[in-house]
Amino acid sequence: MTDFWLNYLDNPTLSVLPHDFLKPANNKSVEGTYTFNIDNGSTDFKFGLAVFAALVYRLTGDEDIVIATDESANTPEFIVRLNLTPELTFQELVSKITKEYENNISQINYKALSEVSHRIKEAKGLDENPGLFRLSYQHAHSNQQLNTTVEGSIRDLAIYTDGTKFTIYYNALLYSHERVVICGEQFAQLTTVSGDTDTVIAEVFLITDFHKKNLPDPTIDLDWSGYRGAIQEIFMDNANKHPDRTCVVETVSFLESNSKTRNFSYHKLIKLLIVVGNYLKETGIKKGDIVMIYAYRGVDLMIAVMGVLKAGATFSVIDPAYPPARQNIYLSVAKPKGLIGLEKAGTLDQLVVDYISNELDVVSTIPQLKVQDDGTLVGGKLEGADNDCLNDYQKFKDQPAGVIVGPDSRPTLSFTSGSEGIPKGVLGRHYSLAYYFPWMAKRFRLSEKDKFTILSGIAHDPIQRDMFTPLFLGAQLLVPTADDIGTPGKLADWMAKYGATVTHLTLAMGQLLSAQATTAIPSLHAFFVGDILTKRDCLRLQSLAENVFIVNMLWSLSQTQRSVSYFEIKSRKADPTYLKNLKAVMPAGTGMHNVQLLVVNRNDRSQTCGVGEVGEIYVRAAGLAEGYRGLPDLNAAKFITNWYVNPDKWIEQDEANKKSSETSERTWSVKPRDRMYRSGDLGRYFSDGNVECCGRADDQVKIRGFRIELGEIDTHLSQHPLVRENVTLVRRDKNEEPTLISYIVPKDSPELKTFFADVDFPLKKSNDPIVKGLVAYRELIKDIKGYLKKKLASYAIPTIIVPLVKLPLNPNGKVDKPKLPFPDTAQLAAVAKLSVSSHDAQAAEEENLTKLEEQIRDLWLDVLPNRPATISKDDSFFDLGSHSILGTRIFTYEQKLNVEIPLVSFKGDQRRPRFPIGLSRYNYSRREQRCRRFLKAKTYTMRRSKELSKELSKSALLESYSSLKQLPSGSVNVFVTGATGFLGSFIVRDLLTARNKNLDIKVYAHVRASSKEAGLQRLRQTGITYGIWDENWAEKIEIVLGDLSKEKFGLDNSQWSDLTNSIDVLFTMVLCHWVYPYSQLRMLNVIGTINVFNMAGEVKLKFFSFVSSTSALDTDYFVNLSDELLAQGKNGISEADDLQGSAKGLGNGYGQSKWAAEYIIRRAGERGLKGCITRPGYVAGFSKTGASNTDDFLLRMLKGSAELGLYPDITNNVNMVPVDHVARVVTATALNPPSSEELTVAHVTGHPRILFNNFLGCLKAYGYEINPADYPVWTSALEKFVIEESKESALFPLLHFVLDNLPQDTKAPELDDSNAAKSLKQDSKYTGEDFSAGKGVDLDQTGVYISYLIKIGFLPKPTGTGEKKLPEVEISDESLKLISGGAGARGSAAK
């Protein structure tokens, strides 16, 4: 093979189309299909391929598109790889496709595409075959399917076409049927441009008429003039109505014995904040001035904020934990006229004090605001003053400042990251602070009875929601201590103790809430979070609070204020299975009341995107923030006038609706503005209008709840004197945690040498640039991190900084980010080892760590994501690459020494906590232990069964077997085991009725019974149960008693001799049981089989027939082999296959016992045994009356689906054959073996095979109220039906099986049945009937089964009228009596 494919397929992008469900583990797939037609004539294949490529580009945003295709139905697959750009026209795309397609056909020098995969694996030294594609577009053919035989590749979606008809095969575990239907509609919509090939591919409108109603209309009114009033006035109104109601509760610290709970009523707080408001107003603060608050979580913050608002000013908050240099940056942006320091926030750093004195014009200051235990408010003494600054203003506590504000007055200044290293200040509006609360109260069941928490970051704008929501509702606000927040497990205790009902948390705080928590919080019913929310986070929270509804309010930004999206996750109590089929990351949802999320085409802003198409998210609402402070150009770029509608429309409407009572407020408002905020986030619509976020259009990211501007990090990095080039990315580490990593190129200078360590690298690592850079420049990395600490918040400092000789560039001259490697575990381990200099090692030895300190050091090494070279006493847990969420893992060890360690102990100086922390080895959970034991037992059982089979084939077989060459004419004696089973009874029927004109057959039936009379009665009863018994058979049946598991069945020599000298043909069937392990089935199914065929070694020559099962083929090997054979134009698995493909991997004892028996029979065949092994699949009911074994998987599926009203839309072929035809094949192959020279195998396969969903869907055709559902949806509905609603279901005994991976478990290989057809043809000379064409189960046959099942009471009658009428079937009263008594529900002899 040439190197063309090796180069062509180097590092391909395997596009994943937008999907609906969590990506399945182990690449599981469930095949679903959808067919549509293109009405505008036949579509040229290459044009269709171009349309598909364009659709993939639009739905994924990937520019590197990789699709598998073919030249015709019978030619090898090959890959077409395209680089698409948004300006491409369809004419250019078709030309590009045609060139690639025709060139790549000429490069096909292989028989199968797997050869290319093998070649790449060998050339690159990979452990496994690489994936070459996930999507394909191919010519229609007879074996089209989702599964691919290309090793290493997993196909998610495939389109097969003949030019007019298009069939999509898709993984139903990834995509809902509705999603695929939409893809088909969008494909058809894209083909309409064929008449205008100059259309740009990125500008074709993808919204179909059917889904337009579910997507937001960007032209409707969003209540631009719906101002509800200022939050401070609403708060005052609540205080007047309910003065004695508790407003704020500051709770006691569990670590401070002298602390106490403090309660503040609405009336008390109003008095205090009026004092603050009047002080600010009287000391020079004017409407719209900014007042900066140095904050601390407590009632003091609430008083300061509301006091600023009462003065008509704008409040902004600084967290004292920020570095002083960064505090100064915030001050430089805000330019405040007033300052309020909370006493508990501590004193200002001198650097900040100097900046305020020298750079700001501050007219009003409250230096140390505090509410004392007696309820009095103090503000601290100003410089040079003798009295408290608020003393003279206490008299105003009953006289509000009287400042009137309007909807466009600016109450808040919040900060967000800045790409130039300077945070941006965002001015909020009063319109937003209260507008959405009435809707939220109704939608999320909030009221004045709720108890809210204040847990958001004190300098982050979500804390506004924490405070203002309860104040609007007249509810209560609970304030925790830092110890409650910082100690894992205690936050849950605190919530439960104080009865918190509603909480707003960042994702990071939510993780702290669930970390090590054991206390349930039944009172909590609403949990609001604004972040990328994962299923794991939801499950953790709901394990603590089963009544909690989690509401993700994404885009709760400073820029959008309260105008946000929401997605509600139902509580575990309301719907235990709700989360099961959601993806790992929760959707962003849809806009709340009068808020729209518009996903806009990035290449044509006049269009909103279609379902699934990647676009940029704009938030349209009346409640957007005013804009960025002092940044008019940025405001113009981010706060954009809606271009979908004329803005004058709303101005005219507002003027017409103006009321005279609004005059004072309108003084402080502007005209209605229909604006959109350009979020910079990429997203796509679901079909129901919900939005999922799928990345950023810029370089802003969110880690652990903090929004970080990568450009800001890079700006500061570039200003370090020893950094020449740099770029910062977010990559996932080995634990799938998002990690900040910066790549730098050091600036060559004399100073650089002082930061360079000359290391003697081992030969193995001498060529690894990552290891060399991290080791040689470790001192430079420390210096850079120290430098960044002074410029950035701690969460924005890169965890890893990788020095490189140069940054890789792509052909466009930009940094080639995909080629920037994340150091793997082996590299980091090498760095840790090589970084320990002799000085470091000596210093570590001289530290003389105590046993406790050694334990703590080892614990840190266990927890830290990237192992450091050394840890000294002066190192910080956080400086070594950790963060507060990761810190909670340390507390998994605290129970060993019975200590509680508040996370706050890591902060402050951020040194090692001074607490004894024990270590423990990782122990597998009980579930993991059970899984390991099961897998071990399964592997052992299969290996043991194989070993025992080999041993028995040597020790238990006769030296030789002399067999018949052909069936004797006239009288034939047949020995049958399993005659009282479902299939066995029909074999007896066939033997005694089908050939009675040409053969005189007598049946020797082995029956387990106390006497021959009792045995005959058992046989008779079985025949009557299934409606097939003829009393005339009794004289043709001889009952044989004995134990098949014993040699000679336990008979004496005389009885054994009489039996063996009488028999011409031996039939053996075995116990069918899906639960018993191999060890329980071995004696009967394996040893019993040996004892039966050893009869063939006695004096009289015999044929031998063994009824096996396709269960012996139930491994992935045969499913894949079947696909390969069908692709080669063959019929399926050969009857000559030796079954080595299932020598391992069979999942149940029944299949293992069949495999073992077949293995031993083959060895006997090598010693002369003649006859046939016959393998049926599912044995269905009697074709004439529908008589069935009701304890059957397929019939349970039929009944269970009817009960549920849903059936799984699984498109696997089902190899089910009516029992009378299976019996005919078994008797034909026994009496007329396919070969007289050797032991052979015959497959029983359906002609035709019915699809699984068509079989279950037959119910609808006959009048049942039932609909198809994607498998994940069906499993959730079934689980809810059985478990939550406690309803009886026919599927209850099989619940573990049907809920696991039914589509994969019911996938069966296609089978070649040439030998079966040959025997049936030969048998026609006896029967007069030629059944060599085979039989199967179709819609009409299923109707017979349904009628039978209704008549015996297994199925209810249909409630509706279907397209087909159920046929009449006859069942005798005697049969019905036996069935009602429990007969007819035994296992059959085959699958």
Curated annotation (Swiss-Prot):
It catalyses: (S)-2-amino-6-oxohexanoate + NADP(+) + H2O = L-2-aminoadipate + NADPH + 2 H(+); (S)-2-amino-6-oxohexanoate + NAD(+) + H2O = L-2-aminoadipate + NADH + 2 H(+); (S)-2-amino-6-oxohexanoate + AMP + diphosphate + NADP(+) = L-2-aminoadipate + ATP + NADPH + H(+). The modification O-(pantetheine 4'-phosphoryl)serine is found at residue 884. Residues 847-927 form the Carrier domain. Pathway: Amino-acid biosynthesis; L-lysine biosynthesis via AAA pathway; L-lysine from L-alpha-aminoadipate (fungal route): step 1/3. Its EC number is 1.2.1.31, 1.2.1.95. InterPro entries: AA_adenyl_dom (IPR010071), ACP-like_sf (IPR036736), AMP-bd_C_sf (IPR045851), AMP-binding_CS (IPR020845), AMP-dep_synth/lig_dom (IPR000873), ANL_N_sf (IPR042099), Far_NAD-bd (IPR013120), Lys2 (IPR014397). One of its GO terms (molecular function) is L-aminoadipate-semialdehyde dehydrogenase activity. It is an enzyme of class 1 (oxidoreductase). Gene3D superfamilies: 3.30.300.30, ACP-like, N-terminal domain of ligase-like, NAD(P)-binding Rossmann-like Domain, Nonribosomal peptide synthetase, condensation domain. Binds 1 phosphopantetheine covalently. Its cofactor is pantetheine 4'-phosphate. Keywords: Amino-acid biosynthesis, Lysine biosynthesis, NADP, Oxidoreductase, Phosphopantetheine, Phosphoprotein. It comes from the Eukaryota. One of its GO terms (biological process) is lysine biosynthetic process via aminoadipic acid. Belongs to the ATP-dependent AMP-binding enzyme family. Catalyzes the activation of alpha-aminoadipate by ATP-dependent adenylation and the reduction of activated alpha-aminoadipate by NADPH. The activated alpha-aminoadipate is bound to the phosphopantheinyl group of the enzyme itself before it is reduced to (S)-2-amino-6-oxohexanoate. NCBIfam families: AA-adenyl-dom, alpha_am_amid, Thioester-redct. Heterodimer of an alpha and a beta subunit. PANTHER family: CARRIER DOMAIN-CONTAINING PROTEIN, L-2-AMINOADIPATE REDUCTASE. This is L-2-aminoadipate reductase large subunit. It comes from Candida albicans (Yeast).
